[in-house]
């Protein structure tokens, strides 16, 4: 399996086929039992756990079905955490002001400019998922990995979230890999990968 920079790739298959497992392997959240994950010429599976964490935090953004927002922190604070961790990983001092400005700007782009001080319990499902997407983007990753990002949203909100992801791909030239069971979503991807009986089909 090879994925090029700037592609939108949908991974589809029946429940339990291994879609999420493949996504987790691509993002080095899981280790493959065989084979390798090559990113920009580097075999990620051969790196130390710390180096994998460095690359994962700075180069990959993750969006999950559940928002996984920290309930005691505001939308802005939730978005900031990966950025501040990333600044340490890359050897820079935590540039809090710079990351805060970027986070506020990104939240504004998705219609949450007036919600930055709200905690997750004060946000709707769609707003929480938008916060989760912006959190995934705070380090300007080259790859966005989405696991059923609309799975827990109503149809209208789900479409809005997908439009956001497609627009980010266009404006930022990010590679997007999205796991979905929805064939309508898959139709909007540039390429569809099917997992059947443990095999990858295109």
Residue ranges and their predicted role:
Residues 1-188, 192:
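ABC family nucleotide-binding domain
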Residues 192-202:
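H-loop (His-switch) and adjacent beta-strand-loop-beta switch element
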């Amino acid at each position: 399996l090879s994925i090029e920079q700037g592609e939108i790739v949908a991974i589809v298959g029946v429940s339990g086929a291994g879609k999420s497992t493949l996504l987790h392997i691509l993002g080095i959240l899981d280790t493959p039992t065989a084979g390798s994950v090559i990113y920009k010429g580097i075999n990620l599976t051969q790196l130390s756990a710390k180096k994998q964490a460095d690359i994962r935090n700075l180069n990959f953004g993750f969006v999950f079905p559940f928002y996984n927002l920290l309930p005691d922190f505001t939308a802005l604070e939730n978005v900031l955490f990966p950025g501040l961790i990333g600044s340490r990983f890359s050897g820079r001092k935590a540039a809090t002001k710079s990351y805060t400005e970027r986070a506020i700007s990104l939240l504004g782009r998705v219609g949450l400019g007036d919600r930055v001080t709200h905690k997750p319990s004060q946000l709707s499902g769609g707003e929480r998922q938008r916060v989760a997407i912006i959190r995934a983007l705070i380090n300007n990753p080259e790859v966005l990995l989405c696991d059923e990002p609309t799975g827990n949203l109503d149809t209208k909100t789900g479409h809005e979230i997908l439009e956001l992801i497609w627009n980010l791909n266009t404006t930022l030239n990010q590679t997007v890999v999205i796991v979905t069971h929805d064939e309508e979503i898959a139709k909007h991807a540039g390429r569809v990968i099917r997992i059947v009986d443990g095999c990858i089909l295109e």
